[in-house]
């Protein structure tokens, strides 16, 4: 790798935070909060709540949840109340992916500036950043919910670069989603590490790896 790099900018969800483990932990919290509605053994309800997290699927998932619980004559909170509570419960139960904390600590000790650039609702993303335990490690954080643009708009990448005090050539962006993370970094002129299990670089990323731990060998 080009050792002129001075900063590493991370995506959050699916890059540092383990979505699956976080949803599982959040569902257990919902079971504790609403023991009459949710049960840890009810896998269908858990999957419907996961679908419900994505607002584009929320209405259909809510109806499906109502149908699923109907035989037990149970009444869900209103769609808006449940969407808000489930979203914040998920955010407050963020679980890091393997090697995430170790890698960020490694980069910090090596003197790299560390940035975070994430799309999403401001309140939820900030709650997630704090709950995952990495907040003190970042030199600069950009949440799209606080801005008039989001990934893959090059403008939000430039905002991250400016906050870190580096140029595009001096940064590496790390993410798991082609359309937002990798394409956006490319448009902004930033080298990228695509986290994927694929062996073929179909995204046109600068580097490929299965997890963020690869950075300890790249940098």
Language-model-detected regions and their locations in the chain:
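Asp-based, Mg2+/Mn2+-dependent phosphohydrolase catalytic module
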Residues: 1-8, 21, 77, 101, ...
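Short, acidic loop-to-helix structural element flanking the phosphoryl-transfer center
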Residues: 88-114
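N-terminal helical cap/lid subdomain that shapes the substrate entry/recognition surface
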Residues: 2-98
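A generic secondary-structure micro-motif detector
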Residues: 52, 93, 115, 146-147
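A short, structure-level motif marking secondary-structure boundaries and short turns
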Residues: 46-50, 87-90, 110-111, 141-143, ...
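Short catalytic-loop micro-motif centered on adjacent basic/acidic residues
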Residues: 17, 115-116
């Amino acid at each position: 790798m080009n050792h002129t790099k001075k900063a590493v900018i991370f995506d959050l969800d699916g890059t540092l935070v383990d979505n699956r483990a976080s949803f599982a932990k959040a569902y257990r919290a919902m079971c504790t909060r609403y023991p009459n509605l949710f049960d840890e053994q009810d896998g269908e309800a858990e999957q419907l709540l996961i679908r419900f997290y994505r607002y584009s699927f929320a209405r259909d998932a809510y109806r499906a949840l109502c149908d699923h619980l109907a035989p037990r004559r149970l009444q869900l909170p209103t769609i808006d109340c449940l969407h808000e509570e489930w979203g914040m419960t998920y955010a407050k139960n963020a679980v890091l992916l393997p090697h995430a904390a170790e890698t960020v600590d490694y980069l910090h000790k090596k003197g790299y500036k560390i940035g975070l650039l994430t799309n999403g609702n401001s309140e939820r993303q900030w709650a997630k950043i704090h709950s995952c335990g990495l907040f003190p490690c970042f030199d600069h954080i950009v949440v799209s919910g606080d801005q008039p643009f989001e990934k893959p708009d090059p403008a939000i990448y430039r905002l991250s670069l400016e906050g870190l005090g580096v140029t595009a050539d001096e940064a590496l962006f790390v993410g798991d989603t082609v359309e937002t993370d990798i394409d956006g970094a490319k448009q902004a002129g930033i080298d990228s590490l695509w986290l994927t299990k694929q062996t073929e670089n179909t995204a046109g990323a600068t580097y490929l790896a299965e997890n963020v731990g690869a950075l300890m060998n790249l940098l």
